[in-house]
Amino acid sequence: MIYLDTSSLTKAYVSESGSDEVRQLLERTSESIYISSLSLVEFRCALARRTRALTLTDAESQRIWASFEGDVDDGVFDVLPVDNDDHINARRLIDAVAPLPLKALDALHLAIVRRARALLGTSFVTSDAQQAAAASALGISTQTIALKI
C-alpha cells in the first residue's frame, strides 16, 4: 500500500514541482492508495491558501476540490480515520525523533502511517523534507517527491 501525505496529495491535483512524478506514481501503481481523514482538511486548507494567494482562482479551487471529492467517492483513495491512539502515538513520535523537528500534523500523519504499516504494510510518500527525515528515523519506508525544506 502507498500512503500519501497532504504535501504529495496536493501535487496530484495542483500543478507544481513534483506533480508529474506524483501523477505517474498514482497512474502506474497497482497498490491501494491511502490518505487519512486529516488530509481531507489539510487539502481543503491548501486550496484555500492558494486562492487567498491568488495562485488559484476560486473557480479553479472549487473545480479541483470537486475532482478530489469525486475521486474519494469513487474509491481512488482509501481514507484512514484518525483515532485517539494516533494522537497519543503522535506525541510519542515527537520525542522518539528528537532532536529532528516534527510539526504536530506531520507527527499525526506518521502515527497513522505506522498504524497502517502494522496492519497492511505501507510505503510513505511525502514532499516535506523534515517529515521525510523523521519517517526515515522511525524506520518507515519513504519515497520523497520534490522535497520542500
What are these regions (language model features)?
Residues E42-R44:
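Well-ordered alpha-helical segments within folded domains of soluble proteins
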Residues S17-D20, Q24, R52, D71-V79, ...:
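Noncatalytic, solvent-exposed loop/strand surfaces
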Residues M1, R115-I149:
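Acidic, PIN/NYN-like endoribonuclease modules and their adjacent C-terminal/linker elements
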Residues M1-L40, R50-R63:
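Short, well-structured N-terminal submotif of metal-dependent ribonuclease cores
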Residues S32, I64-G75, A132-I140:
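Short, mixed-charge aromatic SLiMs
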Residues D74-Q130:
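Active-site neighborhoods of divalent-metal-dependent phosphate/nucleic-acid chemistry enzymes
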Residues R49, A53-D83:
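Helix-adjacent hinge/juxtasegments
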